[in-house]
Structure formats: structure tokens, C-alpha cells
Amino acid sequence: MASNNVAQFAAELKMPAGVLLEQLQAAGVQKASEDDALSETDKARLLDHLRKSHGATDGDKRKITLTRKHTSEIKQSDATGKARTIQVEVRKKRTFVKRDDVAEGAEQGQAQVAEADDDAELKRREEEARREAELLEQQAQELLERQERLEREEAERRAREEAAEAERRRAEEEAAAKRAAAEAAAAQQAAAQQAAEAKQEAPGAQSAQEEARAAAERAAQREAAKKAEDAAREAADKARAEQEEIRKRREAAEAEARAIREMMNTPRKAVVKAVEPPKPVEAPKPAEAKGTLHKPAKPAGAGVQARPAVKKPAGATPATTQAPAAGAGDRNKKPGGGKGGWQDDAAKRRGIKTRGDSSGGVDRGWRGGPKGRGRHQDSASTFQAPTEPIVREVHVPETISVADLAHKMSIKASEVIKVMMKMGQMVTINQVLDQETAMIVVEELGHRAVAAKLDDPEALLVEGETSSDAEQLPRPPVVTVMGHVDHGKTSLLDHIRRAKVAAGEAGGITQHIGAYHVETPRGVITFLDTPGHEAFTAMRARGAKATDIVVLVVAADDGVMPQTKEAIAHAKAGGVPIVVAINKIDKPEANPDRVKQELVAEGVVPEEYGGDSPFVPVSAKTGAGIDDLLENVLLQAEVLELKAPVEAPAKGIVIEAKLDKGKGPVATILVQSGTLNRGDIVLAGSAYGRVRAMLDENGKPTKEAGPSIPVEIQGLSEVPGAGEEVIVLPDERKAREIALFRQGKFRDVKLAKQQAAKLESMLEQMGEGEVQNLPLIIKADVQGSQEALVQSLLKLSTDEVRVQIVHSAVGGISENDVNLATASKAVIIGFNTRADAQARKLAEANGIDIRYYNIIYDAVDEVKAAMSGMLAPEKREVITGMVEVRQVFKVPKIGTVAGCMVTDGIVKRSSSVRVLRNNVVIFTGELESLKRFKDDVKEVKQGFECGMSVKNFNDIVEGDQFEVFEVTEVARTL
């Protein structure tokens, strides 16, 4: 829905309308209320304003770097006088910075906006510019007034201070003059006294008195002049200090005004300037004599790394910071006016900086250290052992590889392997350990092991499952029809649904689990039809898990059978009520009373006997008793008070899953609570995806499915496992994360189980000798059939012949399956699937046997026959005759020959023989020769004499008996 006003746009952005109005006004879009119309231009201006306020800039390149390389050759004589040619490569790099990008971009943007906007937009912008100019002018005027006020106040204060200072100086001068006059009067008085005394003493003393008076006057004048000079100096210092303070205040005010103007003119974005680390001060290089070949001596302390430069104070001027840099640049210049020789290249090579070396390559090498320090005493590379061991807390998941476990403990994987070898287990670096073993290894290495499930997204899924506030409404019951094979379950459902499903099933037996919902006058019922064959145990267990009521179908002419007992066990395990339907009552041999007695023996007691299970006689053929059965089912549902939320995310269970060649993974699910809509994101085990299509049991598209409704969905990432829980999530990213986690967890657990079973299987094979394997690849149409067929074939394994399932999956037979069969020498079994054209050609070329079946009986019987052919044949002995020794002859180079009489049966040349003496077997072997007179014969019959010799046996005496027998091989069966 397009947003036409401010309120709709705020609802679309999921934010308050008041906040949106403030942002629009900040962007210059004048909107007064939530009902004002909003155009695309207004939205574009708001977006541009938000981008600028968050610091978004264009990513165009602003500088170009050009690198030039020039190669030349110079000739230099070495110490021996030979001329050497040296390649000199000069590289120059120049960077051009485009500084007017911002201005050009602003001009282009203004030009484009000016062309695109209408007259009203131009007037509005002019008004905004005028207001901004007035605001800036007002701020500048206020700043000027503030400066003038400060200057006026400063001038008045300075005038007051100057007047006070002048008054103080005048008072000091008057006091000094008074003191000088007093001193002069005292001096005159003293001089007068001295003159009087001098007159009395000598007439020549008058001249001395005058000189003393003149000296006193000069001293007084010097004292007064010195005091006046000190006062003038103090006044000048005060005036300079006041002027400096006024100048600083003026500069601060100007800086503040400049900052305000920049803030008003620049967009609101903050660019944090990266703080450059202080560069270490390089020691000055000694001047090298040009043309010298020897290595100049190092000055004292050259090997010591220079201390880092002291940080500059905040108020340092640029002049003070640039002077040392300029000096350093002068010191780093090459001698000889910048023309470098080959000795400069050697110095560069010596000064190359390596990783971890901050000294610029100085003193590198095992001879480079200062005097008194060896090559192993370098402080930069000396290893210091930790003072105490570090004990880490290691979180051990359910499965972890040796490499990951070592990484968690911050040690090498070889250390973990050593510990495992000491514990008697040989492991590799990629081997997966179970949680218990890994925790033992962690404790053995001195760390603390904690069993934890880290980064488990399923924990977040469980935490997110809160009690739904949706209203609990009545839902239809889910009824599972169970019973023995051929007892009429599907036929009963066909009569209820007015359909004919049983006629279309191979062999007349159900091999898939089916889900249907039927609308009756009293309400809706959802039926699950489960297979009755013994191979489909897991499928029946899934049906009992997802059901509310079990309808147990028992044939009146057959009674309780093994799968009937199993269905009763499934229903009791799930705590599900049972409604017994005694089917085929229209047959003459039907005996419902016998069925009731057999069911009572299994713990299912009818209501007429005081139990809680209703028994309903029905006939799927004539339809008798169907209405009573449905009424009993709905009555049980009313007693259970089945309720589920409707307006909530859907939850359910996978009834069946398959891989369709055109549709991809398809899953039949039963919604248990909530409503499943087309487009929802679902998670089913390790599969996830968006519901692209949703079909009901009749193959018709539907948009939603409520509680207890079975639907077929498409759009999953892979075929989910039958029986997996289905849940609707709001975020596809979260669904993918949980699905990938489940896949990895399943793979790790599977690898751990395989690793644990390797040794056991190896010991079993060593104890049992050679075991024949029948490798099979199974492809089925749906998940349940594939699971049932695999379990049925694995049950055929014996101690001598084992069924090895190389691969089993859902879908058609592809080239990958044929290639896998070629590598593993396996037979491919397709259950209700076929191979495509490429797979058939590849199978014919490689001689791979592909067998197709649509009835599980046939597949099991043929695999059983193939296994029988692989059994070692049974050897049986058949006694063909008895011979009595009459005379013994010693023949040179031949040995002992017995003259015999055939007393019973027949003696053949290829037969084996036992030598009996006093009816005790003393030797078993083969005949070496059989003669009659001097001729070799093939056989001698009863009543004839013959000569016989036994291979490798000469201890024959008269009276011995030879028992002649043959060994025949008899084929065995399973």
C-alpha cells in the first residue's frame, strides 16, 4: 500500500508520527499535521537529510598515485681494482589529490536539484537561505556586540587601574621627596655643626664642609631617580600584561565566532581524526666518507634504541613542531648532495626493518651486539617464562575435535594427543571427542572443564516460546486408524471419504501414511491412515504421537494379530483413548465375541464389560456401523475438550516427506496449533524455507490451514525427517541459523558414534573371521517408506552375511547414485522410484544392477535370496563303501599297498578314506592309487578285490578297515 500522508508513512516505517514530523521539519519539509500529504520528492529530501546527518559520503576516489621507475647502470671499482657494473633502479611515486570534489559535487547536486524542483521549491529554498543568512548575521552581530562590550569594560577597568597607579606613584614620589628633604636638612645641620667645630679647630675646614654637603645632595638625587625608575618599570610591565590578556580574550572570541560559523555552514557529521602514534626519534647518522669501502665504526651508544619522542603539549604551535622534523630531514639527507653510491644501498640493506624489530635493523645479527653482550643475550628476543601457570575455564560442548579442544586451552594439539596416548587412546588432530572424554583431558591438563552448550540458537528458540495470548478455540480431533495388515483400515476410510484409495495401492496394502479431513454433519474429523505391515513400526509410532484418538481396526474373522498388539502398545504409551472397530462383520466366519475376548486379554476392555473403550461392529464393504463409529469418535473428542489457538504462529508435525523431481522437497504436515499461511517461514528439523505452495489432501491449492488440518507444503531447503516438529518463525535468518546448527550437531554426533563403533566392529570382525557384506543403495519415494525398508533389510543381517546400507535417500535414482554404486560395488534398490535416462545409461555401461519394487514384501524376499546365495555352502559327508584289508605288500619306491575286498558299496578313485583299526579312526586322508590287478581303475564295486594305497600313510596292517566317503556341498538358506 502506497503511503499518501504522514501518518501512513509513519505506520509503514513503524515509528511515531510526531518523530517523523520533527525529522521532516529538520529536513526542510514543512508539514504541520499527520494528515498532510507526502510526495515522493518530500521522501527523497528526508532520505537525503538523514544520510547527511549520519555522515554518509560518496566513495569516489579522490587521489591518484603514479609510480615511475628508471633503471640505469654505473661502474664502480672495488678494492682489487676490478670494475663492477651495478644496476641502479630509481623509483618515484607521486600522488595527485583531487581537492575540489566536494565543491564540484555540491555544485552539480545544486544544479540537478534546481532543474528538478518547481517554482514553489525554489521559493522555499530561498526563504530558508534568507532565514539562515539572517540567523548568521544575527549571531555575528551578537558576537560583535559582545566583543565591543568586553573591550569597553576592559578599557574602563584599565583606565581605573592606570589612575590608581598614577595616584600611587604620585604619593610615592611625594614621600620620597619629603624623605630626601629631611635627609638634606639633617645633612646640612650636621655640616653646620661640623663647620662650627671646624671654625673652632682650624680656619681651613670650610672647604671640607662644602664638599660634604654637595656629596649628600648627590646621594639624595640618585636615590630619588632610582625609585622613580623602578616605579616606571613596574607600570610598564603591568600595561604589557593587561594588553596580552586583552589579546588572548580577543583571539578566544574570534575562535568561538569562527567555530560557530563553521558549525552553521557544515553538515552535521563528526569525523574523528586518527591519532598518529609518536614516531621514534632516529639517532643522527655519522657522516660517511664517500668512496670508502670499509664499514665505519659505530659511535658510542649507537646500538641502543632511541627513546620515543616526548608528547607535544596541547598548546604547542606549529612552528615549534616543524623545526625538529626539518632538522631530522636534513640529517637524513644522503651525503654528496643526494647522489647515493652502492655503499648507501648496503646501508639500506643493513637498515631494513623486520617484524618485531623496532630498532630499524640496527645491531641485527649475532655479531651486532654491543661489547660484553652475547648473541643469546638480546633483550628483545629473550623469552621470559610466566611466573605461574594459567588455569583456564574451558566450555566443552557435546562433541569437539582435538584441534578445537587444544585451541580452547591455548596449547598445541600435539599436547592433547600425548595426553590421550598416555590414557591409552590413539587419536588424530581432526578426530571428534565426546563431552566426557574431552572434560577428562581438560582436567588432566590442569584446566577447569565446564559442560556447556555455547552458542546454541535452539536455546533462544525455547526462550522465545512464550504463552500465546490468542484465544483457545475448539479444534477438530485427529484420529489415527491402526491395525494389522489386510484388516481393512484403508477400505474403512475409503467408505468414510467416499473415495477409492485402497484399489490404487500396490499389492492392496498401505505403504505410506495418509492424512485426510472429513466433514460430517456433527463436525470435522482428521484421519491418519497408517500402514499395518510389520516393517512400518516407526510410521505407526509417529501416527500415535500426533493423534488424539486411535481407531483400532480388527478383522472379525482374523482376530488379534502382532501389529494389533503393537498398535495397542503405541496407544497406551501415548495415553490416547482407543475406539475399537470390529471390521468385516458381513463375512460368514466373523466372530466378534472372540475378538472381544482377545482384546480383553491385551488390556482393551469394552464398555459393556465395564471398561472405557467403545466397540463398534462395522463393515467397510456394506457401510454398516460407519455412522455409529463416527458418533463414538466425536463423543470421545467432546470429552477430551480439544482446543488450540487459531490466531497464532503455526506449530505442527511432519507426517510424511518426499522429493519430487519438479516440485523439490515436499512435506505433508499436520498443523496442531495456530494457522499456517502461504509465505510463512517454517523450520522442520534441519530443513527450513518459505511456504511457496500449500495443497490439501485432494491436491487443491489452499492459502491457510488451521489446527488439525493436514496440508502438503513446498519450498523447504531439503527433505525433512518424518516426525520432525514444524514451527513458524518470523525471521528467515534465525531459521537458517538454527537449521545449520542442527545439521552440524547431527554430523558431529554421527562422527563421534562412528568413531566409537570402529574399535568394537574391528574386534567383532577379528573374532568372527571373514564376514560377507551385501552393499545396497536404497532410493524411495517418501521418507517413511525409505525408513521402513532400511530397517527391514538391516534385520536380515546374520553373523555370516550382513546388509550394508551404503546410502539411502528420498527421490529418483540419479547419476550420483550409480557412481556411488560403482565405487562401492552395491546394488541399487528403487522403491516406487525410477532411474532417469543418464543414470540408466551409466548403469548399463558399468554393469550396475538396479532393482525396482513397489511392494515391500518383494524387496525383502529378493534381498533375502541374494544373502542366501552369499552364504558359505554346508559340507556334508556321504559314506559310499567299506573295504577290508586282506593282505599287505611293501613295494619299493611306492610304499605300502593293501590288498582289499570291497565289502559294501562302491569305491571311487576320487573318494576320501578313513583308516579304522579295531573300529577306531587312526587316519583320514585321500586315496593315492586304486588298481585291479595291474590296471588303474576309476571305481570298484562291492564283491571285487582291489589294490589300494593311502597318501602319506604306510602303517597298514591286515584286518584294518577303510571307510570310503565323499564330501558334498549343500546350499544354505537364511
Curated annotation (Swiss-Prot):
Residue span(s) of domain tr-type G: 474-643
Positions annotated to bind GTP: 483-490, 529-533, 583-586
Sequence segments annotated as region (G2): 508-512
Basic and acidic residues bias (residue ranges): 121-133, 146-181, 210-261
Single GO term (MF): translation initiation factor activity
SUPFAM superfamilies, per database record: Initiation factor IF2/eIF5b, domain 3, P-loop containing nucleoside triphosphate hydrolases, Putative DNA-binding domain, Translation proteins
Alphabetized Gene3D superfamilies for the sequence: P-loop containing nucleotide triphosphate hydrolases, Putative DNA-binding domain, N-terminal subdomain of bacterial translation initiation factor IF2, Translation factors, Translation initiation factor IF- 2, domain 3
Protein's cellular compartments: Cytoplasm
CDD domains to which the protein is assigned, alphabetical: IF2_eIF5B (cd01887), IF2_mtIF2_II (cd03702), mtIF2_IVc (cd03692)
Protein name: Translation initiation factor IF-2
Organism name: Burkholderia vietnamiensis (strain G4 / LMG 22486) (Burkholderia cepacia (strain R1808))
Lineage: Bacteria, Pseudomonadati, Pseudomonadota, Betaproteobacteria, Burkholderiales
The gene coding this protein: infB
